[in-house]
Curated annotation (Swiss-Prot):
Its main location: cytoplasm. Residues 1038-1053 have a biased composition (Basic and acidic residues). Residues 1610-1752 form the RNase H Ty1/copia-type domain. The lineage of its organism: Eukaryota, Fungi, Dikarya, Ascomycota, Saccharomycotina. This is Transposon Ty1-ER2 Gag-Pol polyprotein. Its EC number is 3.4.23.-, 2.7.7.49, 2.7.7.7, 3.1.26.4. The record marks H401, N402, N582, N583, A1217, A1218 as: Cleavage. It comes from Saccharomyces cerevisiae (strain ATCC 204508 / S288c) (Baker's yeast). Mg(2+) 2 binds at D1346, D1427, D1428.
Length: 1755
């Protein structure tokens, strides 16, 4: 870079102050700045980089071009005329040209301001005092290297500066940014130092060492201007220069002050990070030092919070203060002041002990708000106060620590201290005892505490008032003393076994005895100096000996670490045995914990692992000696035998040895287990485990599936966790070759994060032993936990998680540490742990009423990962909660069915273990805790159903089968909660499976025909049909039918009273059937039996010829010849081979299908699409016999808890007959709010597009004068009901454009602010389809238009106000609306009236009567849908004329003019249309479905076997009672609404072949069972697989110029619940399917003929309306046809015999149909059933039949 620059400027031959710097800067040895200059960074890489980045252009080169340099003459350079500095203040020639400096001071060399060109300085003469610059780049520097010095010159005069003139000096770099100015000033100061100007640089007090000369001032001014361009100067520098542009010294002084301040901050931070305190200096001084540093940093803008400050202080504590690290590290809200109180207390106690004064220290663990007790996990804190004189110390209780202290030091084999030793013995480590001194531990000490910090010694404690010892072999005259109360430093009780004498035999052959207490619950044996002083023995820490008052030396003292010790060899042994001493005093407080209890508490781990863990303090709160290990050797846990049964062990030592060289958390093993079958959908089926190679730390995560995105989420989570929590980076992950690990997505993720995947070789499972062994261990534990607790299987992952928590805390036999210890974490506090499945009572924070019991029975699972609470399973609520508000249940009963656990009752042990935690709960109860039983992230396990048999038992107790009164309800407080056992009842879920979680897939028994006989009187039939409840509790309905029996009884298990039905046979003659009708009371009519009516007697009509074409009167507009062939011609009917017609007797036709369950729905009878969607109400009122099951709340059986509390989840009885209409199906929300689109949108590109759309919308609103901009109203002045909330919504349209819309919240608009009679009309879909069909047949041009901001063209009459848009920032103001804003109730109606008036008055159109939004004139037809217009015309110019007229008033955009003769593609109201005039039209939604369906989160199977049909015949939806908790129910209903909403949209647009399935599933929106959801998923899957299908139309070629409108009708008799029939109609115009309808008959039909009549009567009104529309749009004659495959229906329509109408209802229906057919000139024709395409609208069909009926018109 430098060579390039110099080559551009050959005139720089002798060097220049502007030359590019390519080497490190050279420094002198003087530093007048004292602090700041010494801290200035070396000018090395930064300066080189700054210069190397300069370009070679004249504008930015490090050596700016100077055209005047070639011949620098005084007259040739004009003075500067502009610049940042004032022209009148420029230096005079005399000032800039001092004597003796002619070349540098020449006026031509004064830099032009504002630095229009940089001056090129010629080298001064040899007499000059200023330095010369290198003549070439390659010239070596004769100055010292940068490493040789980094200080400034400290001269007192200018003469001294000139005594060490350097030959060559490198200039500073050019300043390129204001942010770089602080670093640049440092290099500039070094430049001045190297130029022998160090004496003029201001010192720390702001004054230079010497006075600056005029020549030096000129040099300073010019060089500063050269290398610091004005545009790059900071603001404060510019402010100084604006006052005095030559005051460079002030700038330097200010810069040095800032550098000094920065240096002080750095020093403070370093000091704070390296604090050290051990009590050698006063605590006040230490506190003052620390607080001054923190205050200084805070004042300089560096905020040090309490948490960070306390951590830094605690890290520097040592000696007796070190323990504060461990007692304080969990206190989250600790302050510096509180920490220093503890430090002061220890210091004062230390000083007081040394001065023989009473001492006291506040216990640092006594926090007011601390609800837990934390165990010190390090060596003792307060037991080693060793003053030189302790004779006058006050007696205090012993302050010792439990054995839970950590110890990682090796043991000592012996200790040896010379008898003549009088000098202090200082031991730096335990091995220093091997000093050649022969004093081994006495053999009488049979208790070898090899884990002691100094084995075989007593710890001298000045703070202990009593002597305590763990070994029973040194206690003489032991006796029981239960009244002694001893506490440790944390004020915790120390259980005492016995009291006795401790006898010493010192080296002067004297014997002494003191009192001693025996306890195994301390870390070290303590020798109280107070008790020694009582027998005239003192400790001299000057000579390190124990001595009497006369100076007699008794024993040496050993100093090890911070403490002083005396050997146990001076103790005399006793003859008492350990069992004797342990039995001297037995109480509840000293009783050891039984091993079976600890075994179960610690997740059924083996005894060896538990002992290692207790021995190494990885499990805290108690030690190894607190456990009774006598039964551990031969103890067999029955649950372990069952849960951990195995064949053989894994092969060990199979992984590579090089993995051991990795650091913690750099090498992970992972594996996936699953699936676990027969679980609820909400429970995880898999889990993925991770194991760290070094620490063996384990993680487990639940999975519901093994999809790529699920696995990727887990990997992302664990990598972030390790990075943030352990500051480590994962380098390698070992895994098997499963597809979930080898997929491309995960491989890219690992590659992006720099992680090496290590896969096992094929069929080499041994190489993956770490992960596989972990999974096996966890599964063994899981099975054992579930077996032991009796909890349902869907909680299996909670057992896995509990086991993981415990396993991470258990020590490894090899490393003797736990995974938590290896990871640097504290040990597991077992006092916070409960056995898995422990029965508890949880406080109900939100009871149903004030008198409702406050306790909810539950089972403890595992500690919470997110709080200090516990995860508890509540069977009655079917969910888990995270809470601390619980009480442990106690009981003495047997805990297992198979095993006798009477001898293993651990209630007392559990109470002792959780005593501290109990006090915490009690305090919370007193303070009225606000714990809200937060639902944990384990609620995925809460979906579990009671076994049907269990619920039947509950019902049998709650409801009397003979009592007619409602059952009484017993609340929980009617019975006292009995003592419970640890095991949950087996009835919860003994064999959980999908069959008893979801409604049974077994179909109920079908109605049986007891006798079908043909009688001589006309074929009398006897049909006994059982009364079936709308919802059955059991899987099967019991019914017995005798061939001759006429009595039938059915009991409804859901009714409050038993109903007996007696079937009364009804016989009739003359062609009728005998049937049985139940005698029911008026209250039972809703449960009546609906029997089949006799079929219509068609015997008389059979003799007559049955015409296929009904002769009717014709009008003049109808052709005279209407034959069946002309009606059926050109219809898209299937091609069938000719078959002879097969006539079936009507009586046989009317028999009910044998496999049709009359109360079940199939995808042949799932019922109506009508379904309520309102789910907010807690109680839904359904019609007919809907019942809410009210079960007694008798809970917790006194015998082994054989029944759970009846669940609070609402039982929803499946009753399709109660559903009347689809109120609304919630659409899929495709819009975004303002905060989603802009405020919190992380996609920058998308955010910018939404911002542009936002401003575009605002501009359009202002352009349309939407509101009054002349005045803003105060909110208090306006009636609140006239104020409408407003909001912005954003969405991305299908064409990729981003749109914003400002809308009003019309959903909360007050009714007084609009006219409810006004309607917002849009074009009916049938009208659009009719117009498109006519356009194809008549070669019409189709033009698509869009009117921008259509609603804003309509004025608003009402006085309404809205809040201004957010960008105006006037939240407290209102503006008055002038236009119909989107969202207002009246906006749609206002726009409709506005555009309607304009089309009629200005465009000459008229609206078709009966069809809103369809306008026509002689040439053009317009279909209007809000702001979208579709124009149809045979002449394109007619369309253009309409467009021109519209553009005069509205902002009209032409979406598609439609002028091409080739295929044109449209997107009209969601339909994707391909149209070629005169040939064909194809209607589909492929692109839309491809975009929308994946957003539904439906598990699609793109590569699997495609469904050939949306459903299969014979598949029935079970109507078992569905019981879900409210949130789960609402979630599933909402999911059903989304799925069915999309399916309905597609079906009614063009996929008429799916309408039956859509309608059927829509009836079950409020019954979202697993079966219903699975069927819905299959329907969506079928739509996805066939998303490319299209409705195909071809141009018709009629023989005569007529339009032919046909409806094909069909009905499926009695195939819906409660014997309702399904009816379907398909409408065709000129052979093209334009619409379809499938629905359940609103009335119950009594025969097939009646069902067909009902179907036809439903189709006629729409057929007539369509006929009117076709005649209005196209003046051709029209032929209307009605096709059915029911000959009996045709016979009734054409017959004049009224005797065929057996009752008034049927007669009126048939007569009306006769009138409609004759009055509307309908041609009724017969069509074969195999060709009846309407059959797909009424029932599920086999795949072959379904394809045959649909492949002609949709493919």
């Amino acid at each position: 870079m430098e060579s390039q620059q110099l080559s551009n400027y050959p005139h720089i031959s002798h060097g220049s102050a502007c030359a590019s710097v390519t080497s490190k800067e050279v420094h002198t040895n003087q530093d007048p700045l004292d602090v700041s200059a010494s801290k200035i960074q070396e000018y090395d890489k930064a300066s080189t980089k700054a210069n190397s980045q300069q370009t070679t252009t004249p504008a930015s080169s490090a050596v700016p071009e100077n055209p005047h340099h070639a011949s620098p003459q005084p007259a040739s350079v004009p003075p500067p005329q502009n610049g940042p500095y004032p022209q009148q203040c420029m230096m005079t020639q005399n000032q800039a040209n001092p004597s003796g400096w002619s070349f540098y001071g020449h006026p031509s060399m004064i830099p032009y301001t504002p630095y229009q060109m940089s001056p090129m300085y010629f080298p001064p003469g040899p007499q000059s005092q200023f330095p010369q610059y290198p003549s070439s780049v390659g010239t070596p520097l004769s100055t010292p290297s940068p490493e040789s010095g980094n200080t400034f010159t400290d001269s007192s005069s200018a003469d001294s500066d000139m005594t060490s003139t350097k030959k060559y000096v490198r200039p500073p770099p050019m300043l390129t940014s204001p942010n770089d100015f602080p670093n640049w000033v440092k290099t500039y100061i070094k430049f001045l130092q190297n130029s022998n100007l160090g004496g003029i640089i201001p010192t720390v007090n702001g004054k230079p060492v010497r006075q600056i000369t005029d020549d030096e001032l000129t040099f300073l001014y010019n060089t500063f201007q050269i290398f610091a361009p004005s545009q790059f100067l900071p603001t404060w520098v510019k402010d100084i220069l604006s006052v005095d542009y030559t005051d460079i010294m002030k700038i330097l002084s200010k810069s040095i002050e800032k550098m000094q301040s920065d240096t002080q901050e750095a020093n403070d931070i370093v000091t704070l990070a390296n604090l050290q305190y051990n009590g050698s200096t006063p605590a006040d001084a230490f506190e003052t030092k620390v607080t001054n540093i923190i205050d200084r940093l805070n004042n300089n803008g560096i905020h040090i919070n309490n948490k960070v400050a306390c951590q830094l202080i605690m890290r520097g504590l040592s000696g007796e203060y070190k323990f504060l690290r461990y007692t304080r590290h969990r206190h989250l809200n600790m302050t510096v002041a509180e920490l220093f109180l503890d430090i002061h207390a220890i210091y004062e106690e230390q000083q007081g002990s040394r001065n023989s004064k009473p001492n006291y220290r506040r216990n640092p663990s006594d926090e007011k708000n601390d609800s837990r007790s934390y165990t010190n996990t390090t060596k003792p804190k307060v037991i080693a106060r060793n003053p030189q004189k302790t004779n006058n110390s006050k007696s205090k209780t012993a302050r010792a620590h439990n054995v839970s202290t950590s110890n990682n030091s090796p043991s000592t084999d012996n200790d040896s201290i010379s008898k003549s030793t009088t000098e202090p013995i200082q031991l730096n480590n335990k091995h220093d005892l091997h000093l050649g001194q022969k004093l081994t531990e006495s053999t009488v000490n049979h208790t070898n505490h090899s884990d002691d910090e100094l084995p075989g010694h007593l710890l001298l404690d000045s703070g202990a008032s009593r002597t305590l010892i763990r070994s029973a072999h040194h206690i003489h005259s032991a006796s029981s003393n239960p009244d002694i109360n001893v506490v440790d430093a944390q004020k915790r009780n120390i259980p005492i076994n016995a009291i006795g004498d401790l006898q010493f035999h010192f080296q002067d052959n004297t014997k002494t005895s003191i009192k001693v207490l025996h306890t195994p619950n301390i870390a070290y044996d303590l020798l109280s100096l107070n008790e020694l002083a009582a027998v005239d023995i003192t400790a001299c820490f000057t000579k390190n000996v124990l001595e009497r008052s006369d100076g007699t030396v008794l024993a040496p003292i050993v100093k090890y670490g911070d403490f002083y010790w005396v050997s146990k060899k001076y103790l005399l042994p006793s003859n008492i045995s350990v069992p004797t001493i342990n039995n001297v005093h037995t109480s509840e407080s000293t009783r050891k914990y039984p091993y079976p209890f600890i075994h179960r508490m610690l997740a059924h781990a083996n005894a060896q692992t538990i002992r290692y863990s207790l021995k190494n303090n990885t499990i805290t709160y108690f030690n190894e000696s607190d456990v009774d290990w006598s039964s551990a050797i031969d103890y067999q846990c029955p649950d372990c035998l069952i849960g951990k049964s195995t064949k053989h062990r894994h092969i060990k030592g199979s992984r590579l040895k090089y993995q051991n060289s990795y650091e913690p958390f750099q090498y992970l093993h992972t594996d996936i287990f699953g699936p676990v079958h027969n679980l609820p959908k909400s429970a995880p089926s898999y889990f993925i485990s991770f194991t760290d190679e070094t620490t063996k730390f384990r993680w487990v995560y639940p999975l519901h599936d093994r999809r790529e995105d699920s696995i990727l989420d887990v990997f992302t989570t664990i990598l972030a966790f390790i990075k943030n929590q352990f500051q480590a980076s994962v380098l390698v992950i070992q895994m098997d070759r499963g597809s979930e690990y080898t997929n491309r997505t995960l491989h890219k993720f690992l590659e992006k994060n720099g992680i090496t995947p290590c896969y096992t070789t094929t069929a080499d499972s041994r190489a993956h032993g770490v992960a596989e062994r972990l999974n096996r261990t966890l599964l063994d534990d899981c099975r054992t936990q579930l077996q032991c607790s009796g909890l349902p299987n869907h909680l299996w992952f909670s057992a896995i998680e509990f086991s993981t928590i415990v396993r991470n805390s258990l020590a490894s036999p090899k490393s003797k540490k736990s995974a938590r210890q290896h990871a640097g974490l504290a040990g597991l506090d077992i006092s916070t742990l409960l056995p898995f499945g422990q029965p508890v009572i949880v406080n109900d924070h939100n009871p149903n009423s004030k008198i409702h019991p406050r306790g909810i029975p539950g089972y403890a699972l595992h500690p919470s990962r997110n709080s200090y609470g516990y995860i508890i399973y509540l069977p009655s609520l079917k969910k888990t909660v995270d809470t601390t508000n619980y009480v442990i249940l106690q009981g003495k009963e047997s805990r297992l069915d198979q095993f006798n656990y009477d001898a293993l009752t651990f209630d007392e042990d559990l109470n002792r273990l959780t005593a501290s935690y109990h006090s915490f709960i009690a305090s919370n109860e007193i303070q009225q805790s606000n714990d809200l039983n937060i639902e944990s992230d384990h609620d995925f396990q809460s979906d579990i159903e009671l076994h049907p048999e269990q619920l039947r038992n509950v019902l049998s107790k709650a409801v009397s089968p003979t009592d007619s009164t409602p059952p009484s309800t017993h609340t929980e407080d009617s019975k006292r909660v009995s003592k419970t056992n640890i095991r949950a009842p087996r009835e919860v879920d003994p064999n959980i499976s999908e069959s008893n979680i979801l409604p049974s897939k077994k179909r109920s028994s079908t109605p049986q025909i007891s006798d079908i006989e043909s009688t001589g009187s006309g074929g009398m039939h006897r049909l006994d049909v059982p009364l079936l409840a709308p919802m059955s509790q059991s899987n099967t309905h019991e019914s017995s039918h005798a061939s001759k029996s006429k009595d039938f009884r059915h009991s409804d298990s859901y009714s409050d009273n038993e109903t007996n039905h007696t079937n009364v046979p009804i016989s009739s003659t003359g062609g009728t059937n005998n049937k049985t009708v139940p005698q029911t009371s008026e209250q039972e009519t809703e449960k009546r039996i609906i029997h089949r009516s006799p079929s219509i007697d068609t015997s008389s009509s059979e003799s007559n010829s049955l015409h296929h074409v009904v002769p009717i009167k014709t009008s003049d507009t109808c052709p005279k010849e209407n034959t069946e062939e002309s009606i059926i011609a050109d219809l898209p009917l299937p091609d069938l081979p000719p078959e002879p017609p097969t006539e079936l007797s009507d009586s046989f036709k009317e028999l009910p299908p044998i496999n049709s369950h009359q109360t079940n729905s199939s995808l042949g009878g799932i019922g109506d699409s009508n379904a309520y969607t309102t789910i907010n109400s807690k109680k839904r009122s359904l019609e007919d016999n809907e019942t809410e099951i009210k079960v007694s709340r008798d809970t917790w059986n006194t015998k082994n808890m054989r029944s759970l509390e009846p669940p609070r989840s609402k039982k929803r009885i499946h009753l399709i007959a109660a559903v009347k209409a689809v109120k609304s199906i919630k659409p899929i929300r495709t819009t975004l709010r303002y905060d989603e689109a802009i405020t919190y949108n992380k996609d920058i590109k998308e955010k910018e597009k939404y911002i542009q759309a936002y401003h575009k919308e605002v501009n359009q609103l202002l352009k349309m004068k939407t509101w009054d901009t002349d005045r803003y109203y105060d909110r208090k002045e306006i009636d609140p009901k006239r104020v409408i909330n407003s909001m912005f919504i954003f969405n991305r349209k299908r064409d990729g454009t981003h749109k914003a819309r400002f809308v009003a919240r019309g959903d909360i608009q007050h009714p007084d602010t609009y006219d409810p009679g006004m309607q917002s009309n849009t074009v009916h879909h049938y009208a659009l389809m009719t117009s498109l069909s006519l356009a194809l047949d008549n070669n019409y041009y189709i033009t698509q238009l869009d009117i921008s901001s259509a609603y804003l063209y309509a004025d608003i009459k009402e006085e309404l106000y809205i809040r201004p848009p957010p960008h105006l920032g006037m939240n407290d103001k209102l503006i008055r609306l002038k236009k119909s804003l989107y969202g207002l109730k009246q906006s749609g109606a206002n726009w409709y009236e506005t555009i309607k008036s304009y089309l009629i008055k200005q465009c000459g159109m008229e609206e078709v009567r009966g069809w809103s939004c369809v306008f026509k004139n002689s040439q053009v037809t317009i279909c209007l849908f809000v702001d979208d217009m579709i124009l149809f015309s045979k002449d394109l110019n007619a369309n253009k004329k309409i467009i021109t007229t519209l553009k005069k008033q509205y902002d009209t955009k032409i979406i598609n003019l439609g002028e091409s003769d080739n295929e044109i593609q449209y997107d009209i109201l969601g339909l994707e249309i391909k149209y070629q005039r005169g040939k064909y039209m194809k209607l589909g939604m492929e692109n839309s479905l491809t975009e929308k369906i994946p957003k539904l989160n439906v598990p699609l199977n793109p590569k699997g076997r495609k469904l050939s049909a949306p459903g299969q015949p014979g598949l029935y939806i079970d109507q078992q009672e569905l019981e879900l908790e409210e949130d789960d129910y609402k979630m599933k209903v909402h999911e059903m609404q989304k799925l069915i909403g999309l399916a309905s949209y597609v079906g009614y647009k063009f996929r008429f072949d799916l309408l039956y399935y859509i309608n059927t599933l829509a009836q079950h929106i409020l019954f979202p069972s697993k079966q219903v959801l699975d069927m819905t998923y299959e329907l969506i899957q079928f739509i996805w697989n066939t998303r490319d299908k299209q409705l195909i139309w071809h141009k018709s070629k009629p023989v005569k110029p007529t339009n032919k409108l046909v409806v094909i009708s069909d009905a499926s008799y009695g195939n819906q619940p409660y014997y309702k029939s399904q009816i379907g109609n398909i409408y065709l115009l000129n052979g093209k399917v334009i619409g379809g309808k499938s629905t359940k008959a609103s009335l119950t039909c009594t025969s097939t003929t009646e069902a067909e009549i009902h179907a036809i009567s439903e189709s006629v009104p729409l057929l007539n309306n369509l006929s009117h529309l076709v005649q209005e749009l196209n003046k051709k004659p029209i032929t209307k046809g009605l096709l059915t495959d029911s000959k009996s229906t045709i016979s009734i329509i054409i017959s004049n015999n009224e005797e065929k109408f057996r009752n008034r209802f049927f007669g009126t229906k048939a007569m009306r149909l006769r009138d409609e057919v004759s009055g509307n000139h309908l041609h009724v024709c017969y069509i074969e059933t195999k060709k009846n395409i309407a059959d797909v609208m009424t029932k599920p069909l086999p795949i072959k039949t379904f394809k045959l009926l649909t492949n002609k018109w949709i493919h």
